[in-house]
C-alpha cells in the first residue's frame, strides 16, 4: 500500500502536547509500578521515556534500537540494532506509538515479561501494549515534534503579488 493510500489524515503533535500526554501516561503507570527501570525503544520512545523517568523517579534507562521507518514508509523488515538482556521482568518498555504492531510484536517476543506502554496507539498495534493514552485511527500519520520544525513565513503583505 502506498503512503498516499495508507495515510489520509495528519495528526500534528507539539512538544507541549507530547509532554502532557507522556505525563498523563506516567499517572497511569504510577500505580502499576514500581519498575526496575525503563527500556526506551529508540528513537521514538526516547523523549517520552525521559519525561516518564522523571515523573516516576526512575534513574535506570536502557535502550533497545529497532529500525523500521523511512519517513512515512514503514519497511517490511525490522532491523534490531541493539537489544537488552533478560525477559523484561520488572521493566517498563516505552515507545511513542504502536502503529501496525511490528515493532511492538518484536519487542514483546524479546521481553515478554515487561510492561509495555506507549503514548499513542493505533487499532492494529493496540492489542500489543499494556497501557497507552490516546488512540489514533490507522489511516492517520502522527507528525511528532522531532520530525518537524517551526519556520518563518513571510507576511502576506511582503510576498510577491500574483497577477
UniProtKB/Swiss-Prot annotation:
Keywords assigned by UniProt, alphabetized: Cell inner membrane, Cell membrane, Glycosyltransferase, Magnesium, Membrane, Metal-binding, Purine salvage, Transferase
A Gene Ontology cellular-component term: plasma membrane
Binding site for guanine: 99, 142
EC number(s) reported in the record: 2.4.2.-, 2.4.2.22
Localization of this protein: Cell inner membrane
Residues annotated to bind xanthine: 99, 142
GO MF annotation, one: guanine phosphoribosyltransferase activity
Binding-site residues for Mg(2+), renumbered to this chain: 96
Any GO BP annotation: purine ribonucleoside salvage
Entry annotated with the keyword Glycosyltransferase: yes
Oligomeric form and interacting partners: Homotetramer.
Family: Belongs to the purine/pyrimidine phosphoribosyltransferase family. XGPT subfamily.
PANTHER family (alphabetical): XANTHINE PHOSPHORIBOSYLTRANSFERASE, XANTHINE-GUANINE PHOSPHORIBOSYLTRANSFERASE
Name of the protein in question: Xanthine-guanine phosphoribosyltransferase
Natural source organism: Nitratidesulfovibrio vulgaris (strain ATCC 29579 / DSM 644 / CCUG 34227 / NCIMB 8303 / VKM B-1760 / Hildenborough) (Desulfovibrio vulgaris)
Gene: gpt
